[in-house]
């Protein structure tokens, strides 16, 4: 049984489409930092890169958990075309810090996505704990520190758009 040490439960659905040795979600489960689940609940925040809505700090009051769907980017369109119960949100633009997709916009691992969500929702301490489990975790934070801070202060999607403009980031996917 998982002990909840954070404000919210952290869940992952592992679809086992990638190299298991490189699976960031599996590592979180192994260290007891996330629950491996099969179905999402109605009160979970589902991180979905194709959602129509962007994650905002105010979303925290709507949910009691965060769920990352661990799948291959090669299968992501098909995976996220399926319906997951819960509140679906996408992250604003961020740069990957992982060695496979280093500095690519929005090609995040599950741990990067969960960490970014935690930071935006106001839990930078848990984000730091998660990223510390990976040799490259600090790289993700270094690349996105200012963005994450600004995103965590945004009160609306239009503010997210302004932040993206200030940083010269394309938000056409938004």
Segments predicted by a language model, with ranges:
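Acidic, serine/threonine-rich low-complexity regulatory regions at protein termini
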Residues: 16, 40, 165-168
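Long, charged alpha-helical interface segments
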Residues: 145-174
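Short, extreme N-terminal leader segments that mark the start of a protein/domain
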Residues: 1-34
């Amino acid at each position: 049984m998982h002990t909840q040490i954070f404000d919210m439960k952290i869940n992952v659905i592992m679809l086992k489409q990638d190299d298991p040795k490189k699976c960031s979600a599996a590592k979180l489960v192994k260290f007891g930092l996330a629950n491996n689940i099969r179905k999402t609940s109605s009160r979970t925040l589902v991180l979905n890169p194709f959602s129509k809505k962007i994650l905002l700090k105010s979303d925290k009051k709507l949910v009691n958990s965060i769920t990352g769907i661990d799948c291959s980017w090669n299968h992501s369109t098909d995976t996220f075309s399926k319906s997951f119960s819960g509140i679906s949100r996408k992250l604003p633009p961020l740069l990957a810090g992982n060695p496979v997709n280093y500095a690519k916009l929005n090609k995040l691992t599950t741990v990067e996505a969960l960490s970014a969500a935690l930071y935006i929702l106001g839990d930078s301490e848990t984000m730091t704990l998660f990223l510390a489990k990976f040799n490259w975790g600090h790289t993700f934070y270094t690349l996105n520190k200012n963005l994450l801070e600004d995103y965590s202060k945004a009160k609306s999607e239009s503010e997210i758009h302004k932040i993206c403009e200030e940083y010269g980031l394309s938000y056409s996917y938004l």
